[in-house]
Amino acid sequence: MGDSAVNKWSAGMSYGPVLSQTDLYLLNTELQLNPILQGTSGGFHLLFNLVTGSTGGFNAEARDRDIPFTAKDEPATLPRVTDLIIITELSPWCTIVHNDRGVTMSDVCSTIWKEYTENCITEAEYNCLPARLQEQVKRVSQNNQTAGSWPGAMYYGTPAPNRYKRVDWLRDKIFFDGLQKKDTYASARLGFKAPNIFIMNLAS
């Protein structure tokens, strides 16, 4: 009934309390993910590039026209929460998105982008990769630097292992392709499952 009058995902503060991590675990509340983050919003498909941080979208019915990402201030989940934990099967890192007033769509995109572009791969992480993948990461990193994606690109020809960015690890899978629940994977990876843990899918 409310949906016909006001979109329940509209930006704003009129959503009741924001659940902290403790509230969420005590209540064991199931979270409803914003349809745009699930990739199930009919009118808008999010295009989010993890290398550049650019966000936009398109309507599946009219793919030739770009649509601005106007939903960035909408809540990422209902009920709203202070923290989302995001992992992906394509990298070893865990991204924690935090906002005391409730995590928004913009928080999700900006935090993921910063986590992957402002943090470097450690030498130990790099050395865990098979030689073939190390070579691919090195090539991707050089391409990203040539494109001027990283500040200081001109100072490094071939970056040292600790200069590779986390986004380089993803190789060609640099486009956000939705979040989903996968409790079995979360438990295997983190040792526990929780309502606010989501798996990020990526595409090339």
Residue locations for each model-derived region?
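Extended amphipathic alpha-helical regions
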Residues: 71-204
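Ser/Thr/Pro-rich, charge-biased intrinsically disordered regulatory regions
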Residues: 1-93, 111
